């Protein structure tokens, strides 16, 4: 079994497909000569744009809310990014809600990562447990207490 190195895209794509593809291409150029000895994955984050930002702050002028809103991709845009990435990397994704879990399964990601902030989100974890059949699961526990 080869070691796995995961590149975190997060919101670094800034909601721009061309920028996302540029980042993916640069990661690929850095890694392609090591593929025989190391597995590489690119990790994305899925959030349901309809529910992730609470309606009470959705129209806020808060710069963090406004910046975050610019990072959402449509399903069609995600498909383009996945197709572009699939031949270069294994695919990993952190879903932050139930809609996103369903989309991770539909999009056939190799790995599903549970974010440390979701490590005690029991409704999300139970939703995952009932649906995940083939994905490998990675769980972050950073910041969790020993009891958690």
Where is each model-derived feature located?
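Glycine-rich anion/phosphate-binding loops
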Residues: 14-30, 76-77
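Conserved, mostly hydrophobic/aromatic
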Residues: 8, 27, 104
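Short, glycine/charge-rich beta-strand/loop segments that flank catalytic centers
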Residues: 95-102
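Hydrophobic faces of well-ordered beta-strands that scaffold small-molecule active sites
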Residues: 3-7, 40-44, 91-94, 112-114, ...
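Catalytic domains of carbohydrate-active enzymes, especially glycoside hydrolases
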Residues: 22-46, 107-108
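Active-site-adjacent beta->alpha loops and helix N-cap segments on the catalytic face
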Residues: 16-18, 73-78, 102, 114-134, ...
